[in-house]
Swiss-Prot record:
Transmembrane region(s): none
Protein name: 4-amino-5-hydroxymethyl-2-methylpyrimidine phosphate synthase
Taxonomic source organism: Legionella pneumophila subsp. pneumophila (strain Philadelphia 1 / ATCC 33152 / DSM 7513)
GO biological process: thiamine biosynthetic process; thiamine diphosphate biosynthetic process
Reaction it catalyzes: N(6)-(pyridoxal phosphate)-L-lysyl-[4-amino-5-hydroxymethyl-2-methylpyrimidine phosphate synthase] + L-histidyl-[4-amino-5-hydroxymethyl-2-methylpyrimidine phosphate synthase] + 2 Fe(3+) + 4 H2O = L-lysyl-[4-amino-5-hydroxymethyl-2-methylpyrimidine phosphate synthase] + (2S)-2-amino-5-hydroxy-4-oxopentanoyl-[4-amino-5-hydroxymethyl-2-methylpyrimidine phosphate synthase] + 4-amino-2-methyl-5-(phosphooxymethyl)pyrimidine + 3-oxopropanoate + 2 Fe(2+) + 2 H(+)
Length: 316
């Protein structure tokens, strides 16, 4: 068969290994929603999660998944990436530790090993320590990537940054009672938007509006199905990835349900707060325009419906 006769695939690079917070994507794939949009989607996992924004920015893949703060940083570095929608809205993020560690407040990091995911995690920890009057030489920061739970379990660190609906659940499952110190509360942000998980695209994908609109229509249907029929959605996830059929992952799925975005909308308020916070952390400069990081123009005007409307009651 000639290569030209093969239907081209559309690529989506996840931010980590496939897990319950990717459920809307897997549901849309399993139920054929992407196929109905004439999208043959190849879902890829990164060998190193820190490579995702660069790979997307270079146009090597069509779509990617990444946290809001990393999307802002990538744009500031010159990578042409844009958020076209939201997968997870404000999953609470914070320092996780075992209760037996003796860490009950942020001041208790003195003399401890503090794990962080990437360069911005260290900036956040050091900034909070500075504001709290903690000597930066009195604690040790350790880059451990996304595997916070394993690092605590192996006694590599005493505490580390993670999601309340994921790493905290993992650590409780492995080791028992935990402590969770929310970063948004420590930093007075009023929301945990900096770790919202976004769908990001390179410039070349933005130039294909029908592809982007079709991807978002299908994904929005997957998100609606996930929140409306969680038991069926989890079953579809497990059919796609049988290794996720465990009590632990089922609990992570249940804890993640409140944070799935049904509309996929980029929330202006959240981007504004993240813009101000990243300026405070000196990740971006004062002249950086946060509005260039995201767009809602490709999202459906109304959610998908199996029912044909009797009339449009909003018309004049």
């Amino acid at each position: 068969m000639a290569m030209s006769s093969l239907k081209s695939r559309v690529t989506l690079l996840l931010n980590w290994y496939t897990n319950p917070y990717h459920t809307p994507i897997l549901v849309a794939q399993q139920l054929g929603f992407y196929s109905e949009e004439d999208i043959k989607l190849a879902i890829l996992e990164p060998a190193d999660p820190s490579d995702v924004t660069e790979i997307v920015g270079l146009g090597t893949v069509d779509f990617g998944v990444k946290a809001m703060i990393h999307t802002v940083a990538a744009k500031a570095k010159g990578y042409p990436v844009t958020s076209i929608g939201t997968l997870l809205d404000e999953p609470p993020t914070g320092l996780i530790a075992l209760k037996s560690s003796g860490i009950n407040s942020f001041q208790d990091i003195v003399g401890k090993r503090v794990g962080y995911i990437g360069e911005f995690g260290k900036k956040i920890i050091d900034d909070l320590a500075s504001l709290a009057g903690i000597d930066p030489t009195s604690y040790k920061t350790v880059r451990i990537g996304m595997n916070v739970t394993d690092a605590i379990y192996r006694d590599v660190i005493d505490t580390g940054i993670g999601f309340i609906n994921f790493q905290k659940v993992e650590l409780e499952h492995l080791c028992g009672e935990t402590v969770f110190l929310r970063i948004d509360q420590l930093a007075g942000l009023g929301c945990c938007c900096f770790c919202s998980i976004q769908f990001i695209v390179p410039e070349i994908t933005l130039q294909q509006p029908e592809l982007v609109k079709g991807f978002l229509r299908a994904t929005q249907r997957g998100a609606a199905y996930t929140t409306e029929k969680p038991e069926e959605a989890y079953e579809l996830l497990c059919q796609a990835k049988p290794q996720l059929r465990t009590p632990l992952y089922q609990k992570i799925f249940t804890r993640t349900l409140p944070f799935f975005s049904r509309t996929l909308i980029n929330v202006d308020r959240d981007w504004d707060k993240v813009g101000r916070y990243t300026k405070h952390l000196k990740i971006i400069d004062e002249h950086f325009d946060i509005s260039q990081c995201y767009t809602n123009r490709f999202l459906p005007d109304t959610p998908y419906s199996d029912l044909k409307p009797i009339a449009c009651c909003l018309e004049n």
